[in-house]
């Protein structure tokens, strides 16, 4: 990975902390991802509502428990309002036909609404988030009736209702799913409406941006026409896709995308229409999310749709850790370089050769199962204008440590630690090389134990 002095690959994100204070921040928490728990434990102070995916359906429309719904560690780690997500998934797949059957009669609608209300009351939840997908368009009126009835029951019990909906830019999208969702009616009944403003390009489509900016603008514009602004939660992606030349895409997290890019020596590019990073390798095209792309989406929505209630996110555990700096208002920027005193001229006034220094953090701390990033900057000395490659040592103190991986991307070095990596203090070496000249900086890395161990369930 090569960088130029004039364009060090570090993104300055200047969203002020107070600018986010007016917005709610919710996060869907997939319990089948072992990294999700660590993510919310590390960043709970920024979260105003947690939506763990804890419940689905049985074949008779009753509520089925999913992973970790009764795990005390998971529950105690949730921040803000605790509103578990219930999905209309039967045997692992969203079931529109089962939904149509449940919605078809007043008796089954009422029984299902009672079950959801009892779920919130008996478990002490603040409410529920329903994510009912692939519901047939023909069930639109019945779905509206159901949402109205469910909201009334939850509100009578002093509980809240969140309804997750497909993104759309108008009410003319009548395919199963968005066609069943009357935003005016849902917005009138629910306490919040989470709009899944992602999957513009999806796993079986052609490769492309997951949430283009102009499309986000259109979706938000329609939302403001149909839903009270304070109830609008724009759902943003934290995930990516890896599309092969033929066939469907596989999911890509920030970490896995970076690893794929480095393994294949691919050139990172950025899509102007979405702000999303992407790259290609061996017939594949990968789009994913990072802090810079996320900031562009947030900037657009705040500037043009500042009256919305907040932002929802899919999903904890797959994100660029620096996204939390954007949310908290912490600038994502390298530390200031140390003062540099150019060497004096040689005898006879002959200029000395230009050179460079490496500036970056000297200590980094990361919890088991987490990740941490540090930005390293090339500092020119005596007029240096060349390029330099960045490398990171693959061992700690000369010894390979299982469960630890390091990635150099531009000037950013990121460390990923599995839940089983041994706690301790290690030394990492970051090297900048230009021609025959190499300068290094040693970094002390401390891995702390994660006391909230849990069984990692898989989906």
Q: Language model features by range: what are they?
A:
Residues 113-142, 192-206:
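Active-site groove signature of glycoside hydrolases
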Residues 22-115:
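Glycan-recognition patch characteristic of GH18 chitinases/ENGases
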Residues 85-99, 231-300, 331-337:
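Glycan-binding loop/region signatures in secreted carbohydrate-active enzymes
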Residues 59-69, 140-264:
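Substrate-binding surface in catalytic domains of secreted glycosidases
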Residues 30-44, 106-121, 174-184, 290-303:
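Short, acidic/polar
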Residues 16-17:
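N-terminal signal peptide c-region/cleavage motif recognized by signal peptidases
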Residues 348-459:
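Long beta-sheet-rich domains in secretory-pathway and surface-associated proteins
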Residues 50, 130, 193, 234, ...:
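Conserved, mostly hydrophobic/aromatic
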């Amino acid at each position: 990975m090569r960088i130029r002095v004039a364009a060090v690959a570090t993104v300055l994100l200047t969203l002020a902390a107070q600018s986010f204070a007016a917005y709610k921040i919710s996060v869907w928490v997939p319990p089948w991802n072992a990294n999700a728990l660590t993510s919310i434990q590390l960043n709970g102070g920024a979260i105003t509502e947690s939506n763990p995916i804890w419940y689905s359906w049985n074949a008779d429309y009753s509520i089925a428990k999913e992973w970790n719904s009764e795990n005390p560690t998971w529950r105690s780690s949730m921040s803000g309002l605790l509103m578990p997500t219930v999905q209309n998934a039967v045997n692992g797949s969203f079931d529109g036909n089962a939904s149509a059957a449940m919605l078809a009669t007043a008796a089954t609608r009422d029984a299902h609404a009672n079950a959801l209300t009892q779920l919130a009351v008996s478990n002490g939840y603040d409410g529920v988030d329903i994510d009912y997908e692939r519901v047939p368009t023909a069930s639109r009126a019945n779905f509206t009736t159901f949402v109205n009835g469910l909201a009334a029951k939850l509100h009578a019990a002093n509980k809240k209702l969140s309804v997750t909906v497909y993104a759309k830019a108008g009410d003319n999208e009548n395919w199963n799913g968005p066609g069943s969702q009357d935003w005016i009616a849902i917005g009138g009944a629910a306490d919040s409406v989470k709009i899944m403003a992602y999957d513009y390009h999806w796993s079986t489509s052609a490769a492309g941006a997951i949430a283009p900016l102009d499309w986000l603008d259109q979706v938000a514009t329609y939302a403001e026409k149909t839903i009270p602004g304070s109830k609008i939660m724009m759902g943003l992606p934290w995930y990516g896709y890896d599309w092969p030349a033929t066939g469907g895409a596989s999911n890509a997290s920030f970490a896995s995308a970076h690893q794929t890019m480095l393994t294949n020596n691919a050139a990172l590019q950025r899509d102007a229409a979405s702000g999303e990073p992407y790259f290609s390798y061996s017939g594949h095209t990968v789009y994913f999310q990072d802090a810079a792309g996320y900031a562009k989406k947030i900037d657009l929505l705040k500037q043009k749709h500042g009256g919305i209630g907040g932002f929802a996110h899919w999903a904890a555990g797959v994100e660029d850790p620096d996204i939390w700096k954007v949310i908290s208002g912490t600038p994502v920027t390298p530390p200031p370089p140390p003062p540099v005193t150019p060497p004096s001229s040689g005898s006879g006034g002959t200029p000395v050769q230009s050179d460079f220094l490496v500036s970056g953090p000297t200590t980094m701390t990361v919890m088991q199962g987490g990740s941490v990033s540090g930005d390293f900057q090339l500092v020119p000395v005596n007029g240096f204008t060349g390029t330099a490659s960045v490398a990171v040592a693959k061992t700690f103190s000369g010894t390979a440590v299982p469960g630890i991986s390091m990635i150099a991307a531009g000037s950013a070095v990121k460390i990923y630690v599995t839940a089983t990596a041994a706690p301790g203090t290690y030394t990492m070496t970051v090297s900048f090389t230009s021609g025959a000249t190499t300068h290094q900086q040693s970094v002390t890395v401390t891995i702390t134990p994660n006391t909230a161990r849990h069984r990692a369930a898989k989906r």
